Structure formats: C-alpha cells, structure tokens
Amino acid sequence: MHEAPTDWLDHSARTHPDTIALAGEGEEVDFAELRVLAGSVAAALADLGAGIGDPVAIDLPAGVPHAIALHGAILAGAVVQSMPPGGREGVDVADGTVFLDAGCIERARSRREPWPSYSRHPALPLTRVLSSGTSGAPKPVLLTAGNHLWSALGSALNLGVERDDRWLCCLPLNHVGGLAILLRSAIYGTAVAIHPGFDVERVTVALEEEPISVVSLVPTQLVRLLDAGAAVDRPRLLLIGGGPVSADVLEEALGRGATVVQTYGLTEACTQVCTLGPGEAAARVGSAGRALPGTEARVDDGEILVRGPTVAPAALAGDGWLHTGDLGRLDDDGYLWVEGRRDDLIVSGGENVRPDRVEAALLEHPAVAEVAVAGREDRRWGQAVTAFVVAAGDLDTDELIVHARSRLAPHEVPKTVELVTELPRTGSGKVLRRLLV
C-alpha cells in the first residue's frame, strides 16, 4: 500500500483550528481543543499501560466524550473498538483490552497534558469493528489506517465536501457506518453532530434548527422522518444504507425535495463500496451507484466481489477479492443493483436478523409444529420479520408474539405471524423461503 499521511487530526487542528469538530448535548469542541483533549486521553492511556498497537475499547454512549476518546486512543497508537450502546457485557474484545470510560475522559479533560504527533503506517490496524453477523455471529474485522483514509477520500470525491459541512451521526458508533462519520469528519476538517441514538423528534428538530448538511440513515429511519414531516430537503445529502429501501420511499423523499443517495457497503470494506452521486439521485432510483474512486466491484455468478485499498487485508480471498455473499448485478454503465443476499439474512430497520434464531425461539412454544421466518418487503422496516407457522393444535398468534418477545431482541420479534397448512420445501426437505414472501 502506498505511504499516506495518517496524522489527520494534527492536520485539521493546524489548518482549521477554530472550526467546530464535534457538537452534541449542548457542547461544541473546535479542532484545536479536540487535539489538546485527545492528547490528554493519550497520556491517560499511557498511564494505564496502553500505547502503540495495544487494544483499547471505548465504553461510553455516543456523544462528544466518545469521539474525544476515539481520537485520543488513535493518537496513542492504539487499535480502537467502540462498545455498543448497551455497554461492554458479552461483547467480543481482544485479549488485554484497556477500557476507556467516563472517569478516564473526565480525568483527561482536567489534566490537559501535551502529547506528540503520531502518524501510523497505513498498513497497520487502526480499528477493530465487529461485523454485522451476516453469516452467523459477528466477527472482528481489523481495519487499517489506510482503509479508513482511502474510504474517506473515495467518499469525498463522490459526494463532495464543503467547508461548512456538518454531518449528523445518529448511527451506533460500534458499527462501521457510525464510526466512519467521526473519522471522515476529522480527515476533512469538518464538523460532526453526534446524537446518542436515533430519536425521530430530536433529528426532526436538528434538521429544522441546526446547520446539518449530511445525514446518514438506515431505511427505517428515513421512513420515520418522512412520516414525521421532517425537513428532509434541508441537508444537501441524505445517505441511505444498511439494507433494502423501497422505490416508493425513495420517490417520496425525492418528491419532498430531498437529495437521497443510496449506498452499498459492508464492514470488511470500511463502509461504502458503491454510492450514487448527488446528481444521480433522481435518475438512478434503486441503484447503489458506481464503485467509489480507488475501489473495484464486479459480479461473479451473481455474487458481488470487491477489492481495493478500503478492504480489510484479512477479508481478501486467495484470488485477491472480497467475496461479500451479497447478490447483485452491474448494468451497462457500471451501476450496482443489489438484489439480496446469498444467505437468508433479514435486514429489518438496519438490524440484521437471523431467521434460524427466531425459528428456534418460536419452536419452543408448544402449539408450534413447524415454522419458517423470512423478510417481507415493508415500507417502514425495509424488510419486516414474518413468521409462517404450521400450528400443532389451537394457536393464538398474539400469544406467540408475546412468547417471542420474552426470548428475542426487539428487532428479532416477528412483525406478523401467518398460519399456514404446510411449508414449501425442496425434494431434500429444505424450506423454500423465497416462496413464502
């Protein structure tokens, strides 16, 4: 990989010291102050024995302190992982991980110690991100400094960067989509407004009252904003990823004056692989766009393959390509149209749902003889989790939903239960899910 500067926070603090870097919960931090605070966090980590190449996890809710901790750990040379909103319990972390919590950040804010610059080699790992679990349990992905830098540059060349940009981040920071917003904004020298999560009223107010120019959303969040009458036309870009979005929803957003650009990406490729350009939003409804500059995408036997400097080195197969497991096609102009997944994963509201988990929980109910779970296209959720049940006697579907809630995460609970007399199967007995929806 080519040498490339990775001391982007130092660069932005030097060239745009008074520009707001972080905003959230009534607090704003400019780049000069962020560099000071990040240096103090790096010094605090050194006191804890963490430095270059060591694993550090941030156990803080999404917000300005989380971003300060992230940049401090990067400045220390650590390999950083963000914890999910629910905290560290049960989360896969590297051996010997040092945790940064609220107390660490408060101590760092008070000590304000200087810390030297650090430029990481582009081939060295920068972040440890758990994949979304497309083909099973989430797996750790090590993304290099070069992966993040090239992803930011490719996105900038495609979407553009304006000096007064303020990117609204309401996505979880333990996922690469949220994490990338914090890093890109530091690389660009632009602001990021961080919300502790997605709240439709709060985002609606932010779009109305704050200078938000870019928003990253999953499809269900876009639907909720449309239903709330939010000013979706105010930002210069709405970036939509994380799952399928219906053409009706896209047309509605475009009809309200929004510039909606779909994107296709994944953890192993450091978010965006293909993304529509702002000028293509209306003409290419339903497409995920062309590959970003520096990235290649092709389709082999229906499967989307990716290679380029944004791909995690360990994710590459022997042929030099990342085999995504996603299905799609490239049109004659090179635009990608995502057509589903090679496996049966359901993406509902931006969350991955494994049908086998849901089926196992439902089969624990004594009145369920057989069950198959599939995703049905849905305006709000992208795909609604739907259970098709062969009953063993009398079955109250509402009672079955209650049963599911006691055993599954909220996003895994079926939105609908349909009673059927039999499940469609192959000659070998496998359920044909595609015939259910």
Predicted regions, residues:
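Conserved AMP-binding/adenylate-forming core of the ANL superfamily
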Residues: M1-T6, D10, D18-G49, A57, ...
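Conserved AMP-binding/adenylation subdomain of ANL enzymes
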Residues: L149-R166, N174-V214
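AMP-binding/adenylate-forming catalytic core of the ANL superfamily
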Residues: G308, L327-E412, E422, V431, ...
